[in-house]
């Protein structure tokens, strides 16, 4: 009888622990889509320059916000996109070209710190759409 009670106690503890882990995992997974919706919900319209280099904004730069962790672009046409950063030390540093299909959100840059100055370039030509940063 002692062994049977002890076994039930251990099984109950395991079940409670597993249930707690499941609840915590579900809560974390549910938070991720909310963050993405919040980020993309603040998207702005963009229109690149009409001549090469095809970029947005047409001059200067924009600054990342705490709304998004990444720089997200939804071009009307499919295009190779890259993000160019302007560090406070001067100069410009651009990441590699990334293909983003027309009409869908794609990542132009990931894990970008808040307050980072940047602009976006399009390789194939004039582009317009939405950007969230």
Describe the function of each predicted region.
Residues 1-53:
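N-terminal prepro-regions of secreted/extracellular proteins
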